[in-house]
Amino acid sequence: MKKEDFFMKRATGFAAVLMAAAMVFTMAGCGSSKDADTSAKKETKTEDSKDKENSDKQFIVGFDAEYPPYGYKDDNGEYVGFDLDLAQEVCARNGWELVKQPIDWDSKDMELNSGSIDCIWNGFTMTGREDDYTWSKPYVDNSIVVVVKEGSGIEKKEDLAGKVVAVQADSSGLAALTDEEDNEENLKLAASFSDLQQVADYNTAFMNLEAGAVDAIVVDIGVADYQLESRTGFAMLDDKIRTEQYAVGFKLGNEELRDRVQSTLDEMVKDGTFDDIAKKWDLSDMVCLGK
């Protein structure tokens, strides 16, 4: 064999090896690129699924539709109020749809435990109920007060002896007058009434007071303030029945949803949105979250 032929064959063989190696490398590179594309698509799909899950979520808030300024129907037939505004902002920040679900207050536990609502958010007193629900942090300081007609001669709690007093069924006002634990003073007060009438809602109570069917109403101070601003001929006693706090009540054990809502409320406190909503409803002096 000639020397030139020998080197030509060696060169041709070497070139073939290089080409084969290049093809393997290229295929490997294409495979890596394909794997990377597939991984990226999976991540995008997962993120899209999460976004869709959030956007599809309904947040169903159970509330008393006759409990201003926390939740009620306005003159336009819309459900409005401080608590509903807070819930709306929480939903907006989480991509949820808010469903405002009016409930009978004395059926609230059944609604919550059956899953008909996600939470009770409407001037809901946590004081004395701490172990019955999974609670948010308290966000309003509340007082239970007494409202009477002007000129009735009732100026202090003791003047309620022998009187007919109205209170909402299954309310914190009723609990303040009937709870047996560490409540001797209020139990004595309630025993002095000629009658303690339970009504379905406070609008009914105020109509009964105006008509003279009852002598006084035991009610939350926020509701009393709202009613006294929109009605004439009523007065609020300086004496308070009890002080307490409002919070959002979730089904016992539903900590995941509670934590999501609470973290959003905390964000709203930090950026000032919570205080802005409180100012809108003249409740700045009563809110306590973040203070």
For each predicted feature, which ranges?
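Extracytoplasmic small-molecule ligand-binding "clamshell" domains
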Residues: 45, 50-123, 271, 280
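Bilobed "Venus flytrap"/periplasmic-binding protein-like clamshell domains
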Residues: 65-68, 79-89, 124, 145-200, ...
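Extended ligand-binding regions for polar small-molecule ligands
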Residues: 84-93, 154, 158-159, 163-172, ...
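Periplasmic-binding protein-like
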Residues: 65, 141-148, 221, 225-263, ...
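Bacterial lipoprotein signal-peptidase II cleavage site
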Residues: 13-14, 27-44
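Acidic, polar ligand-binding/catalytic clefts
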Residues: 88, 92, 97-159, 232, ...
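Short helix-initiation/N-cap motifs at beta->coil->alpha
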Residues: 84-85, 99-110, 192-207, 244
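A ligand-binding cleft/hinge motif common to bilobed small-molecule-binding domains
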Residues: 107, 123-132, 176-179, 207-243
